[in-house]
């Protein structure tokens, strides 16, 4: 049994390296700073954890500021970063958050530690009691285009329907959404759409 576990880990590491190494090399060669980006987020029962992503923004980007609150987010996003965000490849390092137990594959996306409006609205429906996910119902039903109240309602739908079958549905729809680049709006939580 231990040898089986070891071989599975070896296969996992090799598969990840095939994806990670080219991305790491491109980020390192095209912009200053670390390849990875860590940020304090809200986990299950509102416990803090550090989420891991590929860095997609310049090192002078204001710290701990949600992208939608930046005056002009495009000026901070690197060219490589724009591609990674559009394809959701920047989220790949969160596989390690899943291995650690901080996150699930499916669940509400983890809020920044200082997103008080999102956190408080989620409190009303018990959403903060769930383990956050790599993808979730809100991600495949609007993502960046959703204002926070609508995003919370989508999270509530997931909270009320948690099941293996619903998770499989979310996973399938995520794959479709990623290929179509649905809902990717830099700086958007519905605000940009409303202004237009």
Sequence positions of predicted segments:
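Short, conserved beta-strand/loop elements in beta-sheet-dominated catalytic cores
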Residues: 6, 82-104
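A hydrophobic, helix-centered structural microdomain
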Residues: 7-8, 12-60, 97, 164, ...
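Soluble non-cytosolic domains of exported or imported proteins
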Residues: 16, 74, 86-90, 162
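Short, glycine-rich, amphipathic interfacial segments at transmembrane boundaries or analogous
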Residues: 37-76, 134-153
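Alpha-helical membrane and juxtamembrane elements of multi-pass inner-membrane transport
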Residues: 74-81, 162, 166
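Short, well-ordered beta-strand elements within core beta-sheets of diverse protein domains
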Residues: 80-87, 156-160
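Hydrophobic structural segments characteristic of membrane proteins
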Residues: 96-196
